[in-house]
Amino acid sequence: VLIDPLSPDLSLDPLYELFKNPNVVKVFHAARQDLEIFFIDKKIIPFPFFDTQVAAMVCGFGEQVGYEKLVRSICNEGLDKSSRFTDWSARPLSNKQMHYAIGDVTYLREIYEFLSNKIKNNKRQAWVEEELKILMDPETYTIDPKYAWRRVKTRSSSWKMLAAIAELAMFREKYAQQKNIPRNRVYKDDCMMELAATRPKSLED
């Protein structure tokens, strides 16, 4: 089932009720951004849930492994990613976009079953639970704009650049919270790094 959360006449209440159902495991890949949206919108964190990226890390697939890699490695399938950078705010969505959206979740059940069995066999359930505790904590999604810089990964030791990153991260967080949009839609981290490094003095720069 495809659900368009931007549809003006669609109530998402049944979906949120499902999120609260303790008898249904909700499976995500790289859940943090999705969970943050649900928490900001309804103060709900789906439970119980399973993050295939976290589980894959515990199973030795590496940190922050992508969904596409897991589909190839576990399911021996490929994904059509040609619609990834199309305009997802435009309506109606094209058939190709809807096919992409379906593909983005089609293999989650198979990946979940493979990883959960591997975790049980290796007796690493506690490792996964420890990682998921962070994602289940409401404090994870309550961001003070002053401290938004802590989420930004940088190797720079330049105090000027670090100060610029702190200001840019604070502005982005404030704006994203005011407009209720993902922070990456304001500007992404790589764009922030470039701005912090060059520190333009005018719009022309």
Labelled PLM ranges:
Residues 95, 111, 115-205:
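Accessory DNA-binding and partner-docking regions appended to nucleic-acid-acting proteins
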Residues 1-118:
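Conserved DEDDh/DEDDy metal-dependent 3′-5′ exonuclease domain
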